[in-house]
């Protein structure tokens, strides 16, 4: 019995040590990235040299972030380009190297981005295939999307992912990230015919979530603060989407 208790004690101690080490590594990842550039409100780190076109990418990120009425003064972010996939797996929040980008919204303002062609403002998709909705989702989209998550977390609490529905968290980040490059009428048409592109489980895209947020912000006149303070239920959102189909404005726009 004493042996078992001693073993359990060592296991608990080892687990705590590993956890503390991991938190330390992810909170202060800079030593694992050799290249650094500072531009405006961004500190950029990478495991490869950073081309000068990063300034164009970040200017476009800031253009997209203007879409957020939650954006305040002095929003500073650290961006880490993980060209080696193991870095994205380790530092991202999902222990996966398949994501486009990820962000730590609870402790830091760190954004982790997969291998990218910075000069061309695009990420390199997992597996080397084509990126869905690539025209609307350049590299600057992914950075702005994750920055939007951080902005929301600073406004409404570090554990927002546990407080709000997925459609709101990802829909708002997609709304901000796309910087206005979203055809509401076309996506609403796809929604009405039950297109797989509007179903996140089928497409992996946030179009359906974005449509909900765009309806509230652009058609119903809500502010982002109002949505996050009083998020509509799924049933309420479905009712609003259905009602919009029969509204005079909707009829005029189709």
Describe every region a protein language model picked out:
Residues 65-81, 158-164, 186-190, 223-231:
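Surface-exposed patches in mature extracellular/periplasmic domains of secreted proteins
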Residues 2-5, 9-27, 199-254:
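Pan-zinc metallopeptidase signature
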Residues 124-128, 156, 194-198, 210:
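Flexible glycine/proline-enriched surface loops and loop-helix/loop-strand junctions
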Residues 53-56, 60, 64, 138, ...:
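Extracytoplasmic/secreted proteins, especially bacterial periplasmic and envelope-associated proteins
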Residues 31-150, 154-155, 236-237:
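Juxtacatalytic substrate-recognition/specificity segment
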Residues 66-70, 148-157, 174-182, 214-222, ...:
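Sec-exported extracytoplasmic/periplasmic mature domains
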Residues 155, 162-198:
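Post-HExxH zinc-binding segment in Zn-dependent metallohydrolases
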Residues 22-25, 29, 153, 157:
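Membrane-water interface at transmembrane helix exits
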């Amino acid at each position: 019995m004493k042996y078992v208790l001693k073993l359990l004690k060592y296991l608990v101690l080892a687990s705590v040590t590993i956890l503390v080490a991991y938190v330390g590594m992810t909170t202060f990842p800079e030593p694992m990235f050799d290249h650094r550039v500072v531009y405006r409100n961004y500190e950029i780190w990478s495991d490869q040299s950073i081309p000068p076109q990063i300034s164009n990418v970040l200017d476009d990120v800031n253009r997209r972030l203007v879409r957020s009425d939650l954006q305040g003064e002095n929003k500073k972010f650290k961006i880490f380009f993980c060209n080696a996939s193991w870095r994205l797996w380790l530092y991202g929040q999902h222990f996966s190297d398949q994501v486009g980008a990820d962000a730590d919204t609870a402790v830091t303002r760190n954004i982790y981005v997969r291998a990218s062609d910075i000069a061309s403002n695009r990420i390199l998709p997992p597996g080397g295939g084509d990126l869905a909705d690539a025209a609307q989702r350049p590299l600057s989209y992914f950075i702005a999307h994750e920055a939007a998550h951080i902005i929301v977390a600073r406004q409404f609490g570090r554990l927002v992912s546990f407080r709000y529905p997925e459609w709101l968290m990802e829909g708002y980040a997609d709304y901000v990230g796309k910087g206005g490059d979203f055809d509401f009428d076309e996506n609403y048409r796809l929604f009405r015919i039950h297109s797989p592109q509007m179903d996140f489980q089928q497409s992996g895209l946030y179009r359906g979530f974005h449509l909900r947020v765009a309806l509230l912000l652009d058609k119903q006149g809500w502010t982002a603060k109002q949505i996050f303070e009083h998020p509509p239920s799924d049933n309420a959102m479905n009712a609003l989407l259905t009602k919009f189909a029969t509204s005079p404005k909707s009829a005029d726009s189709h």
